[in-house]
Amino acid sequence: MAQSKFLREYKLVVVGGGGVGKSCLTIQLIQSHFVDEYDPTIEDSYRKQCVIDDEVALLDVLDTAGQEEYSAMREQYMRTGEGFLLVYSITSRQSFEEITTFQQQILRVKDKDYFPMVVVGNKCDLEGEREVTRQEGEALARSFNCKFIETSAKSRINVDKAFYDIVREIRRYNREMQGYSTGSGGSNAGGPSNKMEVNDSDAEAGCCSKCVLM
């Protein structure tokens, strides 16, 4: 199929507690390798050009600090982000419980009832150390009206799909917001009424998608 010549940039933000694998997911997406040891992130930005569902996309991915001492920086990147990956580790219940705080803060900063997000349960390769069931992750995402996916940065399981899904959700959200603003004339605060399907099959991981490093 013909691809659009317009290069649309998507500002994606990866949030979550410390040590959940945010940097590993981002680097695996951008550079296709797993980083086992690294210093805790303060804030790193990466760019990569992709074709997702026959549309060109430039992903501008912000990898954020999970440590509480950097929490004052959160509102700044939450204001500019177009879509958020809410990452926890399936081996850490504490990191799972922190996800709600991130979600609520994003909605407060955006002054919205809904905004494009994907809940990501990382480290699914460590099944023997699992503290959070898949069903719990799905239930949390359902309560947020967003999609859920389990990933492994180490084994590169569903890494691309997690980022592609948030781009797809941004596109859908923007289309609905355009229709919403030109429709009944109601407030935009609520956002689209038809949220992303939570239970889509992970088998769609690479459909019509490819990336090129910028």
From Swiss-Prot:
Compartment(s) of residence: Cell membrane
Propeptide residue range(s): 212-214
Topology with respect to the bilayer: Lipid-anchor
Region (Disordered), start-end ranges: 178-197
Signal peptide from the UniProt entry: none
PROSITE patterns, sorted: RAS
Keyword Methyltransferase: no
Biological processes annotated in GO: signal transduction
Record PTM Cysteine methyl ester, positions in chain: C211
Pfam family, one: Ras
Keywords for the protein's UniProt record, in alphabetical order: Cell membrane, GTP-binding, Lipoprotein, Membrane, Methylation, Nucleotide-binding, Prenylation
GO molecular function terms attached to this record: GTP binding; GTPase activity
Lipid positions (S-farnesyl cysteine): C211
Motif stretch (Effector region): 38-46
Gene3D superfamilies documented for this protein: P-loop containing nucleotide triphosphate hydrolases (3.40.50.300)
GO cellular component, one term: plasma membrane
Activity regulation, free text: Alternates between an inactive form bound to GDP and an active form bound to GTP. Activated by a guanine nucleotide-exchange factor (GEF) and inactivated by a GTPase-activating protein (GAP).
SMART domains: RAB (SM00175), RAN (SM00176), RAS (SM00173), RHO (SM00174)
Binding site for GTP: 19-24, 35-41, 65-66, 122-125, 152-154
Role played: Modulates the activity of the adenylate cyclase catalytic subunit and therefore affects the biosynthesis of cyclic-AMP. Plays a role in both surface attachment and surface recognition of appressoria, a highly specialized infection structure for plant penetration. Regulates appressorium formation by coordinated regulation of cAMP signaling and Pmk1 MAPK pathways.
Subunit structure: Interacts with farnesyltransferase beta subunit RAM1.
Family: Belongs to the small GTPase superfamily. Ras family.
Name the UniProt record assigns to this protein: Ras-like protein 2
